[in-house]
Amino acid sequence: MALTVETKKRPEGSKPKALRRSGFIPANLYGHNGRESISLVVDAKVVERLLKAAAVKKTEIELNIPELEWTGKTVLQEVQIHPAKGTPYHISFLATAKG
């Protein structure tokens, strides 16, 4: 089963706390072979479904960023969980192939 996640580029100057209140989780896409990282936002409901279906550093995820016309294979590199609430706080994707 292939997992596909659609993300948006994070708006310049946006505060992570405000994004979370709006129902988005901040995320980063780290490049393959030293490419620059990209700041993203993912819908919180999509993140919850993703975490139920994917294992960190094991499950391949097709990531789609329409604003940048980028689609590629990634793995979930890291998930930060809020210590008190137990909800996802930040996620990191690692590109596994050139996108």
From Swiss-Prot:
InterPro entries xref list? Rbsml_bL25/Gln-tRNA_synth_N, Ribosomal_bL25/Gln-tRNA_synth, Ribosomal_bL25_short, Ribosomal_L25_dom
Q: Name one GO cellular component term.
A: ribonucleoprotein complex
GO BP, sorted A to Z: translation
Q: Where is the signal peptide?
A: none
**Keywords annotated in UniProt:** Ribonucleoprotein, Ribosomal protein, RNA-binding, rRNA-binding
Q: Give this protein's Gene Ontology molecular function annotations.
A: 5S rRNA binding; structural constituent of ribosome
* CDD domains, per database record: Ribosomal_L25_TL5_CTC (cd00495)
Q: How does it assemble?
A: Part of the 50S ribosomal subunit; part of the 5S rRNA/L5/L18/L25 subcomplex. Contacts the 5S rRNA. Binds to the 5S rRNA independently of L5 and L18.
What is the role of this chain? This is one of the proteins that binds to the 5S RNA in the ribosome where it forms part of the central protuberance.
Family of the protein in this entry: Belongs to the bacterial ribosomal protein bL25 family.
Q: What is the name attached to this protein's record?
A: Large ribosomal subunit protein bL25
- Could you read off the lineage of the organism from its UniProt record? Bacteria, Bacillati, Cyanobacteriota, Cyanophyceae, Nostocales
Q: What gene name does this entry carry?
A: rplY
